[in-house]
Regions:
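Epigenetic mark-reader domains in eukaryotic nuclear proteins
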Residues: 1-18, 47-149, 156-159
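Short beta-strand-centered aromatic/proline hotspots
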Residues: 34-47, 54
Length: 159
């Protein structure tokens, strides 16, 4: 099993058709009658046939339900990281996708085609937090340390 934060997490899982996925990748996942789901691959457990994946889901604005029916004001390509995780079969993987995890106020450079994630969707409390807010760390401290390290490293190194 390969988990986010492990030293061997850069080892890819290769499909026979040439697709390649790693822990820490974002990908599109097959869905029925709706746009593909977007997920952050947290671990891959290799098994015979298709491996199992642990995925943290990223939500599109239309899927975010806030308190008191407040409407989400979001950029056209904005998505929201969440603490919602599931195990799923790799058979549902479509292909990798780009997600730029950015600090509040940082814009995606012109010419870059990507989803953008500035905020976290707290499903239980039905609210949004900025990725760099410290207030929500106690909400799901069992998930956040590796993710925050990964995201802050990405923000500092890639943007």
């Amino acid at each position: 099993m390969f988990c986010a934060g492990q030293t061997d997490n850069k080892l890819p899982f290769n499909f026979q058709d040439g697709r390649e996925f790693r822990v820490g990748d974002c990908a599109l996942f097959r869905a029925v009658d709706v746009p593909p789901f977007i997920g952050f691959i947290r671990w891959i457990e290799k098994k015979e046939g298709y491996p199992k994946l642990r995925v943290s889901w990223l939500y599109r604005p239309a899927d975010v339900k806030l308190n008191k029916g407040i409407q989400v004001n979001a950029a056209p390509n904005e998505i929201f990281y969440s603490f919602h995780q599931d195990e799923t079969s790799a058979v549902s993987l479509l292909h990798p996708c780009k997600v730029a995890f950015l600090r509040k106020g940082v814009e995606l450079p012109v010419g870059i085609s990507s989803f953008v994630c500035w905020r976290v969707y707290d499903i239980d409390n039905k609210c949004l937090w900025w990725l760099t807010d410290q207030d929500y760390i106690n909400v799901s401290s069992f998930i956040l340390p590796v993710f925050i390290y990964y995201i802050h490293s990405y923000i500092l190194l890639h943007i």
